[in-house]
Structures are given as C-alpha cells and as structure tokens.
Amino acid sequence: IPVEWLPDNHFLSEPGEFSDWLAGRKVPIMEHWYRKIRKRLGVLMEPDGKPAGGEWNFDKLNRKAFKAKGPEVTFEPIQFEADDITTRVRKDVAQYLNLVGEDALDYWPVNREQARQVLNDFIEHKLPHFGDYQDAMWTAEPWLYHARLGSALNLKLLHPAEVIHAAESAWRSGHAPINAVEGFIRQILGWREYVRGIYWLKMPEYENENYLGADRKLPWLYWGGET
C-alpha cells in the first residue's frame, strides 16, 4: 500500500531541514540551530538582519533567585470546570493508575478556547516576570510565571507560530522585556524544534543510549513525598 508521509504543520522546521543543518557538524548545538531558524522565520529579528535587542540569547539575565520573603507577586492560574470527558478521565486515572499526588486536570486546557485563555493570561500577567525567574522555585508555588502551554501545543490546540507571535508582540509593544520574551521563544523555537529533530534523526537507537551509564534505581525519597 503506497504511503505519503505528510509534514506536521504544528512544527515550524521543514522536512529534512534539521538533518540538512546537522550534516557535517560534529556536535548538534541547539543554540546554532535556534539562530538559524530564527533567521529563516524572521523571529525577533531587525530589518538589518541583527537579532532584536542586540543579542541572540539573554539567558545570562534569566537566573535570578527570589529574596528571603519569596516572590513579590504571584498570579492564580486559570482553572476550568471539568466537562464530561475530563470527569471520566479523572475516574479512570483514580481507578486504574497508582500515581503519586493528586491530579491537576482543572488547570489544563482541553479545547482551543481554553488554550487561548491560558495563552492570553500568560502574556498579560506572567510573561513580564518569566525571564528573570524562569529557573526559580519557591515552596507551595508550583506554577509561578510559567505558561502551562506545553500540553496545548502538543495536542495542537495552539500553533507554535501564534504563541511566538503573541510573545514577540508583547516585547515590541513594551509590555514585556526582551530577556523574558527571548527566553520564552527559545523554549518553543529552539528546544522544542531541536528535540524533535534529534528524535527523528536518532530514533529508535537513541531510546537505548545511556551516555552517563545510569543504571541505579531511584532511592525511596523520590517516591515518599518527603525529603
């Protein structure tokens, strides 16, 4: 049976683009790939071909820690009323899966309208703080300034281009600083596309690679809920 392999239009790299880029390179450095695809798509680029803000990567500004009192401002995440499908899924998870903790299904968008709400909420409230504290953690604050858009992207409720455009527009309008916007866009245009490229290029052998030789079982403290 003849099969036609169609490209996934919910990614921004073209078929064969990653493998062509990697050909002849000894090390697949994500930063180099990220710059290449930014140039091609014109994301965070100026008319003269230079990166917006004068630098390609502002990660050095994105490593702040909270002071002793913790985050100065936090935002309650949007929650959604469970529909019939979510309710059934919750029952199935409780019945058939022995998982640690409690489900958080009410916090995750399950349709396009909800996904757009989460995106707009992130751009309006959290993106301005995302860059400074994207690596920070604080007790009893599981969300902080993160977007919660990973599942919406992977389930194709949002297109990566619309998410990137929303973030870039926030910087160009003065709503969010460049380090926050560039750091966020790098997660989607850089890491998301890069990891997909590695997956398609290296699998299935890649699944069994173990460069660090990790073969010990995780200790009990990973499962006990106490540290």
Q: For each of these PLM feature ranges, what is it?
A:
Residues 114:
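Conserved functional hotspot residues or short segments at active or partner-binding sites
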Residues 117-120, 124-227:
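Gly/Thr-rich phosphate-binding loop signature of adenosyl cofactor/nucleotide-binding cores
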Residues 1-108:
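Beta-rich, aromatic/charged-enriched effector core domains that present basic-aromatic interfaces
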